[in-house]
């Protein structure tokens, strides 16, 4: 397995809309394993393929307390939404920033698993929010898009300063 580089805002590649996975091949399965390893290494609870510059509809999520129950969602689709929720969200692609994002409280999802088998599930609480957040990535959308233009600008400026600082000190 290998760690993948996570793209950071405002990288334009994060705005790419992911294409459906045509077939779950051994290469896709290896990539999924690398995504899971990267998600755990980055201490995230979810990761979309778009965030690692692979523009196919793949998401990995683990909201379990023990951090040992990864979910793989290939070609995920939210089939139903209900209720209103929202928490202060963060993102591996927007390090150090958080913002309140309106989300549905419950979602129903259909997807393929790591082996290409179809499955469906209902999610609420943190899992529902995480699914919506990660599927936004597949559509080229970031949580900062839900924030005010001023807050989004401040986050962008902060991350650009950090990037310049890191580039100078390497």
From Swiss-Prot:
It catalyses: N-terminal N-formyl-L-methionyl-[peptide] + H2O = N-terminal L-methionyl-[peptide] + formate. Binds 1 Fe(2+) ion. The active site is at residue 134. Its EC number is 3.5.1.88. Its cofactor is Fe(2+). It holds the Pfam family Pep_deformylase. Transmembrane segments: none annotated. Keywords: Hydrolase, Iron, Metal-binding, Protein biosynthesis. GO terms for biological process: co-translational protein modification; translation. Removes the formyl group from the N-terminal Met of newly synthesized proteins. Requires at least a dipeptide for an efficient rate of reaction. N-terminal L-methionine is a prerequisite for activity but the enzyme has broad specificity at other positions. This is Peptide deformylase. It comes from Aliivibrio fischeri (strain ATCC 700601 / ES114). The lineage of its organism: Bacteria, Pseudomonadati, Pseudomonadota, Gammaproteobacteria, Vibrionales.
